[in-house]
Each structure stands twice: as C-alpha cells, then as structure tokens.
C-alpha cells in the first residue's frame, strides 16, 4: 500500500516505515503529525484518485529530527568583466518516518461522488430534452425580376 501525499507544498510517494526528508515542519521532535491532503491511494492494485484530495484519507507520521541539508553553492560570473559572486544556501529540513496510511471512507466517498455526478448529468439531459421554443420563420427572399 502506498499513497501520494502533499507535505509542506511538495508531493511525496510514501509507504509504511519509509523515512522522508521534507521542508521544515513546526512540530517538535518525537511528536506525531497527520497529513490529510492525500492525492492518490493504492491498496494492492485498488487505486483511489482524489479530486484534488481524498476525503477521510490521512497519512500518520512521526518527526524524527530537524536538520539542515547539504550546502548548495550559487556562483555567478560575468566573463571579461571581473564580476564574480559566490553564495551558499542550506535548506532547513525535517526527517519524518511514515507510521501508517489510513483510507477510512476513501472509496465510499469516491463512489458517492460518482453517483452524484451521474445524477447531475441525467438532470442536464432532461433539461436539454425539453422542447425548445419555436423560432420565427426565415424572411422570404425577394426574387430578382428580369426586365
């Protein structure tokens, strides 16, 4: 079983007991966190796709540690001008471990949504099938008389 979940603005494919580095979360080390924005859920071939998220589905995780990523060097240079600029950046990260994926009501909600969409489509067909107002007869064309 795996899920595609949005964590801190990024999408991750996660499964149980997977360790993931995400952008810094405000939670303390050792605390549990739940992510409700599950975009896709695969339960042994049974795929549930959210529009945009699956209602009732969640991913539970535990915060392991807060750390900084490797330094990324930003180097700018203009040739023949003597311009060189060197900057560095270290991203603040949080390491989490996925403890479980909950799909409570995910498939039921999706089936209910499909039924509602089908009912709406049937209602629009009934409206379209209603008799339309008669249009005015087209104007008669004047015949060219030859003299």
Swiss-Prot record:
Q: Does the keyword Ribosomal protein apply?
A: yes
- Which InterPro entries does the record cross-reference, listed alphabetically? bL21-like, bL21-like_sf, Ribosomal_bL21, Ribosomal_bL21_CS
Keyword set, alphabetical order: Ribonucleoprotein, Ribosomal protein, RNA-binding, rRNA-binding
Q: Which GO terms describe its molecular function?
A: rRNA binding; structural constituent of ribosome
Task: Please cite one Gene Ontology biological process associated with this protein.
Answer: translation
Q: Which PANTHER family match?
A: 50S RIBOSOMAL PROTEIN L21, LARGE RIBOSOMAL SUBUNIT PROTEIN BL21M
Q: What does this protein do?
A: This protein binds to 23S rRNA in the presence of protein L20.
Q: Which HAMAP family match?
A: Ribosomal_bL21
Family membership: Belongs to the bacterial ribosomal protein bL21 family.
**Name under which the protein is recorded:** Large ribosomal subunit protein bL21
């Amino acid at each position: 079983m795996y899920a595609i979940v949005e964590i801190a603005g990024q999408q991750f494919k996660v499964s149980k007991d997977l360790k993931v580095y995400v952008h810094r979360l405000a939670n303390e080390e050792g605390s549990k966190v739940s992510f409700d924005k599950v975009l896709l859920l695969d339960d042994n071939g049974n795929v549930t796709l959210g529009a945009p998220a699956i209602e009732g589905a969640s991913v539970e995780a535990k915060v392991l540690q807060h750390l900084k990523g490797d330094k990324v060097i930003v180097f700018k240079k203009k040739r023949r001008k003597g311009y060189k600029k060197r900057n560095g950046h270290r991203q603040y990260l949080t390491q989490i471990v996925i403890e479980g994926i909950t799909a409570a009501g995910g498939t039921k909600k999706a089936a209910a949504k499909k039924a509602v969409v089908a009912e709406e489509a049937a209602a629009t067909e009934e409206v379209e099938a209603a008799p339309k107002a008669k249009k005015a007869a087209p104007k008669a064309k004047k015949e060219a008389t030859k003299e």
